[in-house]
Amino acid sequence: MQRTLANAKYLKERADRNSFEECLQYTASQFIIQKAGETRIKAGYHWYDSTTRDTFIALPGIALSGSTAKIFDEVLQSALKYCYNGRFARDISTHIVNPVFDADTSLWFFWTLQQYEKETTRTKKQIWKEYGETLKAILNAFKSPEHKTMRMDDNGLIWSDDLSRPLTWFNAESNYGAIVPRNGYVVEVNALWYNAICYALELAKDAKDKTFLSEWGTMPETIAESFNQIFWIESEKYLADYANHTHQNTEVRPNQLLACALDYLTLNEKRQRKVLAIITQELLTPKGLRSLSPESPRYEGESVGNVFVRDKATFNGSIHPWFVGFYVEANLKLFG
């Protein structure tokens, strides 16, 4: 009898799951957790904790789709506790004594706020008032000479280089460093960088922040020119995954998709079409985008074996569904 009553109470309190959309919303809500007095997004069950990159990428979908902005605000306020002098730590945890920082994480914060503005009634002026100091601190941190492994170069692009560990979402590593090294100018980092500066300028313009506009106003043009010069592979008609002063990595990977999907783009329409064409041809599957083209000699078609072998496959062929949203956005921009 007690079990029957308990089951009845559970069924009454359980969220509706009468449609695919309701099932998605219900499942997404399970990643919102309360821990250490904070509202966080769990990166994955069962062994992942909370990270800033995963939080910023997932938060709009989890907290703004069929939900209220209250959860969004709570998660952002919790994440802001882990922003140190303009850099978000990789991990959201009160137990981390020496936080580590990645090249792209802080830039995803700008993208998250862009989705926030689109889905709520918050104005640009309000967002700048509440988050402007953090946004300025992030941009200035990349300009600072203190951070040699992640810095703005003279050409306006972000140079990230650390032989001891990975600095992007390609985060598999061994005792010898990143399993898939990507040192130098990284394509999605710089696509996010351009988007971040353009969005900050738009907010600052609405808020009449003349000092910020004066300091950063000419940067988009410089970055766009450098981006096309550094990343565009003229012989192949797509973007390098990363590049340095003497070499372009020509492997076909999904990271270049962000250069076609964000709100502010450095590529003209013709180049966007070329990038989408190669992604569609070599990376698109019914489940998401491959992390590497099957045409590459490094392609791994299966994720089996020991930890090192599986980690290598994760970023050399395994499919990642999270790119699907950006693939759709890029196509909508071009084809409506």
Could you say what each language-model-derived stretch is?
Residues M1-G336:
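Acidic, mature catalytic/reactive cores of soluble proteins
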